[in-house]
Structure formats: structure tokens, C-alpha cells
Amino acid sequence: MKLRYKSTRNSQLRLTASQAIAQGISEEGGLFVPESFLDLTQQLPSLLQMDYKTLAKAIFQLFLTDFTKEEIANCVEQAYAAEKFGGAQPVKVTPLTKHGEPKFLLEL
């Protein structure tokens, strides 16, 4: 099933993920949001076991339904390539750093 996106300012305007990405913002200035929420209750245990890139691919496949699995995998691999993160292996996309007890910061 293809997930469609609607404008927050015009619920009659419905686009595919690729159309919403290409357009950016609706003519009325609204944002494009999924027209329904996905229930990930059943998938949650397996999603929590995935590394960052595998999780990104799985989530994108759920929300970007008009892209192929290969297109999504290629985009994720390019976006999270080691050279974009100082060559670190494994890539530290969102490092968690300790700043005292019990303070941690998630770097985005």
C-alpha cells in the first residue's frame, strides 16, 4: 500500500512521498505529513535490535513507499558513508556523550 501525504493546511491535497519531497511546502504554506499513522507495535522488537543504517532503511521503506528498496538503500549508504563522519567505523551518526552524572547529550 502506498502511503500518501497531505498538507497541514489543505487536507484535500494528497501527494506521494516523492511528490511531497520535490514540492517541499504546499502552496498554502503547509507541511506534508502522512495521511495516517503507522502502527509499528509488532515491528518494534526487531527495529530496536537494528544498527542505525539498517533501521534508517527499514523506517524509510515504511514512509517512502514510492521509492524502491534499492533506491532507499543507496541513499542511506551515501548519507551515512564513513568519510562524512571523519572516517569513523562504525559511523557515529548520533553519538551519546557523557556530561556528568546522570547527564548525557545526544549529538545531532
Model-inferred region functions:
Residues 1-108:
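PLP-dependent amino-acid enzyme catalytic core
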